[in-house]
Amino acid sequence: MAEVRVGENESLDSALRRFRRQCSKAGVLSELRKREHYESPSVKRKKKAEAARKRKYKYGR
């Protein structure tokens, strides 16, 4: 989890900006969206295969 300590002369806005940057680098929001609902292993495999198909089509042109 991202943790930010606010300095004495630091504004809350800049600390919040640092916190958001750390969260995005750590992938907190993407992990949250991924775990929002349970996905069975078969559904995960289907999604992974579909993403690979899309990538192959996109870069194959």
Swiss-Prot record:
Single GO cellular component term: ribosome
Short name of any one Pfam family annotated for the protein: Ribosomal_S21
Alphabetically ordered keywords of this record: Ribonucleoprotein, Ribosomal protein
Aminoacyl-tRNA synthetase recorded as keyword: no
GO BP term, example: translation
Top-level taxon of origin: Bacteria
Membrane spanning stretches: none
Record keyword Coiled coil present: no
Sequence segments annotated as region (Disordered): 36-61
Start-end of Basic residues biased regions: 43-61
MF term (GO), any: structural constituent of ribosome
Family that this chain belongs to: Belongs to the bacterial ribosomal protein bS21 family.
Protein name per the record: Small ribosomal subunit protein bS21
Organism this protein belongs to: Caldanaerobacter subterraneus subsp. tengcongensis (strain DSM 15242 / JCM 11007 / NBRC 100824 / MB4)
Gene coding for it: rpsU
